[in-house]
């Protein structure tokens, strides 16, 4: 966390998932990485901004901030394979699960770095600066 700007950099991220039987491990890895990227985006930048009249101020890709490759660390993946006894091929869903953990992980890491409890996401620079200044 940059104490002067409030910018947060995620320097390392590891996604671990029980995929049941990973029929296509490369695809599983891609799903875990994609979910982590989306979760990191939600944790750091992504939010709808409305003006006082209720009009969205960031309705498009030019205004709605999603993470770029340069914003992200290399995302390590670890695939655990415990076959699912309730599926004929032993597989488990992995497409959605990677999205949620970054929200808690990033929020907790930011709170640790600035010695404040983070109670609202995203941890955008203005929000982080506000937490730092109000400590």
Located regions from the model:
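C-terminal catalytic domains of large/alpha subunits in multi-subunit enzymes
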Residues: 1-135
């Amino acid at each position: 966390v940059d104490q002067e700007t409030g910018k947060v950099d995620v320097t390392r991220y590891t996604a671990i998932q029980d995929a049941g039987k990973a029929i296509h491990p490369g695809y599983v890895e891609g799903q875990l990485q994609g979910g982590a990227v989306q979760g990191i985006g939600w944790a750091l930048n992504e939010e709808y901004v409305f003006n006082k009249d209720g009009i969205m101020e960031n309705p498009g890709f030019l205004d709605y901030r999603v993470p770029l490759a340069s914003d992200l660390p290399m995302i390590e993946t670890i695939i655990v394979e415990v076959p699912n006894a309730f599926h004929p091929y032993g597989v488990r869903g992995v497409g959605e699960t990677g999205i949620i953990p970054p929200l808690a992980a990033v929020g907790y890491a930011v709170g640790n770095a600035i010695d404040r409890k983070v109670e609202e996401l995203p941890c955008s620079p203005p929000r982080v600066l506000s937490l730092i200044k109000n400590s």
